[in-house]
Amino acid sequence: MPRQQPAAARPVRRRSYDQFCASARALDSVGDRWTLLIVRELLAGPRRYTDLHADLPGVSTDVLASRLKDMEQGGLAVRRRLPPPAAASVYELTERGHGLLPVLAALAEWGAPALTERRPTDAVRAHWFALPLLRALTGLTWEGVLEVRLDEGEFHVRTGSGAAVEPYGFGPAPRPDARITLDAELCLELGRGDVTLAEAVKDGRIEVAGDGPLAAELRGG
């Protein structure tokens, strides 16, 4: 009787590039698929697991749970229990996790030229346009909360120094200092630098609402 060959062992996944290099160390933490997109979601604030899964179409529950565990172990995120009556757990970024904002902003700027026609398989969420838009808002001097309305939905962003702490959030703002209405394509044009904020407002492609100093600055006042 022929001897049965042992089953080939599955290759062990490398958890580190084992290179004394800052870029390699960074990729050890965020180089896995989905990790940076989870960071993108958590930059908007604490999220429940179910909310993360809903806003990351295509990720399996096993992979999402694994990435979140890796992020906790790597010091990028923490899991905490909300007080009653919520009685739910949320994930939120640590200070080190928030430090990835410039990385995500640079990736959004680099990837914006690749967003031409939307593919039939492309999912979309309104707050995914926050990062390209933030690039165009960096010149604003007034600190405040700006509500953004697109056909795809609403989100809000912070202007001025507050943008470094909590750059954007989901849905309409409770008490926005100003409100703008535009389309998603213009968000991408602003992110690519094809048009400036002032030009878009002047040409009527951005509708500004509000009476405070932030709205006045957006109008060029």
Question: Model-found features: residue ranges?
Answer:
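N-terminal leader segment of winged-helix/HTH proteins
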Residues: M1-V30
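N-terminal helix-turn-helix DNA-binding core of bacterial DNA-binding proteins
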Residues: C21-S60
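Basic, amphipathic "hinge/linker" alpha-helix immediately C-terminal to the N-terminal HTH DNA-binding motif
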Residues: G31, P83-A106
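Residues within the DNA-recognition helix of helix-turn-helix
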Residues: R67
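Short hydrophobic beta-strand motif reused across regulatory alpha/beta modules
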Residues: L76-A77
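Acidic, aliphatic-rich amphipathic alpha-helical segments
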Residues: R96-G160, A164, P213-G221
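C-terminal interaction segments
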Residues: A173-G221
